[in-house]
């Protein structure tokens, strides 16, 4: 149990360093960009599969 507590403490310290260091703002911008890129790729993939007449895999 003490091992888990130490592990989560270290993770919290690392998150605090990133959060207070200004990296979080840059990471948010990158995440938003990647989100829209992958949404566009999803739509393109769905359209391509619809034009080929294939049913989506379950």
From Swiss-Prot:
Topology class, membrane: Multi-pass membrane protein
Compartments where located: Cell membrane
Cellular-component GO terms for this entry: plasma membrane
Annotated keywords: Cell membrane, Membrane, Transmembrane, Transmembrane helix
Keyword Cell inner membrane among UniProt keywords: no
Parts of the chain that traverse the membrane: 4-24, 27-47
A UniProt-annotated Pfam family: DUF1328
Superkingdom to which the source organism belongs: Bacteria
UniProt record similarity statement: Belongs to the UPF0391 family.
HAMAP family, A to Z: UPF0391
Protein name: UPF0391 membrane protein MADE_1011595
Native source species: Alteromonas mediterranea (strain DSM 17117 / CIP 110805 / LMG 28347 / Deep ecotype)
